[in-house]
Regions:
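Exported/periplasmic cell-wall-interacting domains
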Residues: 34-36, 55-166
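Short, flexible surface segments
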Residues: 41-42, 139
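Intrinsically disordered, low-complexity
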Residues: 1-35, 42, 144-166
Length: 166
């Protein structure tokens, strides 16, 4: 999994081949791993826990426990963690505090903000996208959060033999 901060994109990649691509939102405070910085950490992390199996879209998760509340997309005044949580743990000195800081990939009801930095350190996704991603990744999956562009990692699509020539 690759998270490009400048592109505000999360790409699920297997051996250089793009499996899925999602628009995201990283921290509005930039990147870093200092305690209480509200920044998105950089480097290699891994999925350490997954929370929210079978919850409906918009289900609120507080302190990693479903509350039973459902929040509508773009509900005014609501900045809840919803739908699913993928909890990250850092693998490097530069991101070793990520788990203690509760850095997640999670759903947000503030879907209008997806595509631009708006979070408090986590990686936010649309509910339908986090549900899809959650079902595709496993505990132990590596996550690279980078200042590089997605096209640096993903091979261009090869033309199909079935492509039409005009």
């Amino acid at each position: 999994m690759i998270v490009s901060v400048p592109d505000q994109v999360l790409a699920l990649v297997d051996r250089g081949k793009l499996i899925a691509r999602y628009s995201i939102s990283t921290s509005k405070f930039g990147t870093g791993d200092s305690a209480a910085s509200y920044r998105t950490p950089l480097g290699t992390l891994f999925v350490s826990a997954k929370i929210g199996d079978r919850l409906p879209p918009g289900a609120v998760i507080k302190n990693r426990i479903p509350t039973g509340e459902i929040v509508a997309v773009d509900a005014p005044g609501r900045d809840a963690i919803v739908s699913r949580v993928i909890w990250l743990r850092g693998m490097e000195t530069q991101n070793q505090k990520a788990r203690d800081r509760c850095i997640y990939i999670h759903g947000t009801p503030e879907e209008r903000r997806i595509g631009k930095p708006a979070s408090f350190g986590c990686i936010r996704m649309r509910s339908r996208d986090i549900i899809d991603l959650y079902d595709r990744v496993h505990i132990g999956t590596h996550v690279l959060i980078t200042l590089r562009r997605i096209h640096d990692f993903v091979k261009p699509e090869e033309p199909s033999l079935l492509a039409r020539s005009d």
